[in-house]
Amino acid sequence: MRLLVTLILLIFVLTVSGQYSCSNPCYGNMCCSIPSNNEYYLTTFCDESTACGTPCSAQTYFTADSQRFGCGVTLTICSTSGGSTTTGGTGSAGTSTSSGSGSGSGSGSGSGSGSGSGTSGSSSSGSSSGSGSGSSSGSGGSSGSGSGSTMETGGFYGVCVKAITIDAGPNISVEEEAGMAIIDASSQICQDLFGSSSCGWSDKRSITAVQSSVEDGFPVNKPFNVTFEDYNKIISNSLILDQQCSNKNNCKYNKLELMK
């Protein structure tokens, strides 16, 4: 019985850990790769001694993960209840368009012939025969086209906050245990996005996190609501910042013209 329980636990651990694979392990015990869909679990921490030199008590909105983004980088973190995104493209919801057109034409021709004979009789007799042929042809055509469109804009996506990276981590073993990449952040972020003073990986509170700027037109030091259109703008800005960053390990994204 013990052997069976041990095997079940081993299979469970292997299944969970198999869900996450870091493509770029770094610094011996951390992961430097950024998920292609920008999705993470949110956890909370507060350390006075940090890799970037800024204590947690000096900031209200802060994160770790400097091994991924660099020290002092602004991140926009959003609850993902409204959707998800993938780096390399943007999508939108809350909008719809439709259009259509059609045309048709047809022609036809035909011919036929037939002959027959028959007899009937019991007390009388007779015969008859006949033949005939005919043909007909015709053609016709019709065409039409039409188009229409409908659009809805401004659909609510979710709640976001901006934060500054001040520390490295978490350990890659924690992410492997969680089965997903992790953003370790301040308790205020957990409170603003999920209404809780602390978040653990077992809570499975999903977020997206991307590089951003304090000058992109969105609020700082407080949570803010975003529409799908807003969120697509956030993602577009993050791509611009990433493409123009010359030093991936220490990039503060503070010199760019962004979408506002």
From Swiss-Prot:
Primary gene name: alyD-1
Record PTM text: Contains disulfide bonds.
Signal peptide segment: 1-19
Originating species: Dictyostelium discoideum
Entry's family note: Belongs to the dictyostelium lysozyme family.
Biological processes, Gene Ontology terms: defense response to Gram-positive bacterium; killing of cells of another organism; peptidoglycan catabolic process
Biased composition (Gly residues): 101-119, 129-147
GO cellular component: cytoplasmic vesicle; cytoplasmic vesicle lumen; vesicle lumen
Molecular function via GO: lysozyme activity
Subcellular location: Cytoplasmic vesicle lumen
Job description of the protein: Has antibacterial activity.
Keywords carried by this UniProt record: Antibiotic, Antimicrobial, Bacteriolytic enzyme, Cytoplasmic vesicle, Disulfide bond, Glycosidase, Hydrolase, Signal
Catalytic activities: Hydrolysis of (1->4)-beta-linkages between N-acetylmuramic acid and N-acetyl-D-glucosamine residues in a peptidoglycan and between N-acetyl-D-glucosamine residues in chitodextrins
Sequence segments annotated as region (Disordered): 83-148
Protein name: Lysozyme D
Group of enzyme by EC: hydrolase
PANTHER family xref list: FIBROIN HEAVY CHAIN FIB-H LIKE PROTEIN (PTHR37612), LYSOZYME D (PTHR37612:SF17)
EC number: 3.2.1.17
